[in-house]
Amino acid sequence: MKKICLLLFCLFAILPLSARDYETVPGDMMQTRIYTLENGLKVYLSVNNEKPRIQTYIAVRTGSKNDPAETTGLAHYLEHLMFKGTKQFGTNNAEAEAPLLAEIELRYEAYRRLTDPEARRQAYHEIDSVSQLAAKYFIPNEYDKLMAAIGAEGTNAYTSNDVTCYTEDIPSNEIENWAKIQSDRFQNMVIRGFHTELEAVYEEYNIGLSSDMRKLYATTCKMLYPNHPYGLQTTIGTQEHLKNPSITNIKNYFSKWYRPNNVAICMAGDLDPDKTIAIIEKYFGSWTPGADVKQPTFAPLPPLTAPKDTTIVGQEAEQIWVAWRAKQANSLQADTLQLMENVLSNGRAGLFDLNLNQTMKVQRAAGGSELLHDHGGFFLMGTPKQGQTLEEVRGLMLAEIDKLKKGDFPDNLLPSIINNMKRSHYSLLESNRGRAGMFVGAFIDEVDWKQEVESIDRISKITKQELVAFANQFFTDGYVSIFKKQGIDSLQKKIDKPVITPIQANRDQKSAFVQAIQDAKVEPILPHFVDLKKDLAILKTKKDLPLYYVKNKENGLFNLVFYYDFGQCADNRYDIAADYIKYLGTDKMTAADFRQKFYELACDWSVNVGSENITVSLSGLHENMPQALALLEDLLQHAKADKEAYNQMVELILKGRDDAKKSQGTYFSYLYAYAIAGERNSYRDVMSEQALKEADPQLFTNLLKGLANYAHQVIYYGPMEEKEIARLIDLTHVSAKQLAAVPENKPYLEIPATDNEVLIAPYDAKNIYMRMYHNEGRTWNPEEAAIQEVFNEYFGGGMNGIVFQEMREARGLAYNAYAYYYHPSRKDRKEFVMTHIITQNDKMADCITHFNEILNEMPVSETAFQIAKEAVVKRLASARTTKMGIFYAYLNALRMGLDTSLNELIYQHLDKVRLQDIVDFEKQMMANKAYRYIILGDEKNLDMKALEKIGPVKRLTTEEVFGW
């Protein structure tokens, strides 16, 4: 009896580790396990063994909704501060540091209550001085060093209304080290490096000032949810609050919401669930739960019974948004909203797609829902054509809503939507990020996992009559409209940069915690690189077309690509042809018929024209591939030119070109292309307005039909066997018996930077976009590939790089800053160096000075080098090239003149790379070189004298940059 009792005791003693209770849902294709620890921590696990990596999200059910009203933006800048370390890492002496951090906190509480400008300047100077003392004990970026040491990728975080989420993609052999780091981070966070990080957040705020989409979203929320935090405050916060922060409020917020019973760990990838949950319990099980993490409740929203309009102003293209209020994310109304969204705007065959976009009645129109924890909304978004008013766009969109309410859409649209939803779900399962992202959404919005898993099944049972009835109840006159006009927003305020003394990088220092993680022994992951001779089959069709084949053994999806080795730089008319065919049909089928049929088959097609290649692609459900391919071939060969459709398309193209000038990010892309290649570059090399208007539309249908006459390759990834796909290509794909050589590419060649010069173009904003570019015409040397890879990790790569540390961490000069040494895309092209920064106008000269300092005298650290090198080793060892990536690795190797993949080449030489190699490489390639400074900004707000000292300043007009 005693033996039996002892046996039972031993059995139950090990149950928590090997057979812990968990929830599952029948029919869940991800086979998710959901655990709940005793302290309330939720853990979602899904196994996907495709590669030895795991996507991890740690999601906290709190966001800007819970920001204190007097310090909005708090949740977001707490997210930033979570990267600064704990008592164990990020510091070389936590005890000595603590009283200084406490003093900084008290000084900020006093500072935020001051209103006199001179008193504030003096108080900030004192904060800066104390911060200098505290910085002696601060080891910046130790969290990033830890992530680099374990081979993590995608180190980041995001904050929204209801969520703050921390992301890492880790090798599967580093779960324990990852858990050890994260448990300390989430339980023992220390706020340090505060004033420089807050300045980086303010730079992020500046970037948002130029985004009219942010304004539209914030204004829409304000009208939909006028007495709820969704409408009363934004995630980034107000300018005033960002400049008057409270460390005390941050600590209180962290203490309340960052508790295990308000957090979920979401993981998908190559993991053993039993071992993983045991590790998580080991490190997170003692985390103290919060006494009250219940989400706050707010007063009911006032009813919306009549239309409400408002107008905002911004530099980007005009738009209109129309929105209705909806229920929260975990209500079953979400099912009907998702179906309704797809009836209106699924990107291919919805009412907006066919009746507004296909017919070119507007520049663009779309619709969709956003469902949050407390409330939701359904949005319509429209952009006008040239000469069209926003009121007209709204009227056209509302007319489509009326069709929905009348049931004026095909009966087969609903089953087509279900097929496409299933296809999208299959695609999502291929991605660890997709799987883990679903877990985050369900946890944050308190959606039961069973409800999530069964959503497609429930939606498939909604009838057309039920949907129409719902639409009539939902789309009332209680909607809001936001008219976004084009112009300068006079409400935006300029704030001068604070005087910040750079904090020490201390990059040669290392905490005992970091050393312990580096010393931890893990079972190594052996690299497995794509074998260019074995991992894909290279066949020939009966028509002698090369066929590259990889079998999909995972699901019923396929990808088929016809690849042509010439592109826009050979003939820029193909880009227009690729757009034009979307609006055409044949003698037997209209353009709308084609869209509806492809959507019914749950297949997509596209013609993409790159600088040096053209691809015709088809993808979707395997069982429908033969019919979809026949449809595509029919359209390519028999497309019927339509003069009216062509003229309308030209109007859209010209309006789109004009709109591009109004977007800061798009404008800078054009400027950069002009700066490195001159007038003939991939952005400007397009048909002129005159050429477009004079062209015969038949020309463009002939161009695509004529692709059948040129040599090309076939790429296939899918479930078909080799002989089966070869037979289908022979039977269905149209190609000439004798294929002609493709037109000759005339590449866009970069202009060497032989002397310092400045190119500046005008854009009125509170910040500038700036790049420094160097190219001395040097051909890529494969023997240096490993050195270049480690150099980029060490110098410009991510949060642990020299650039990030010096420009953002030490000085608060930017939110976004990086630098890389780029190898060319083809072996006969040239290498180049590029630095990038987005910064407040009055920080430009500082950025230039400090960028040149680190370029000319690169900080050298053996400690930082070893971490960078190990990060590259672990990243490449755990990388796997799969699916379509196999083909592109093969094509890339051909272009680069390699007989192995580039990753394998780099890995083979990593062991020989030493710090001195990095130092020598940087001195030879980057230090004291001539640079072309490329700046987009408003001259009257910039230090032009500082620019003139660099070299000749060439002022470009907008017309010169764009070519129109």
PLM region spans:
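Boundary at the C-terminal end of the N-terminal hydrophobic targeting segment
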Residues: 17-19
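N- or domain-start disorder-to-order transition segments that initiate the globular core
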Residues: 25-51, 525-555
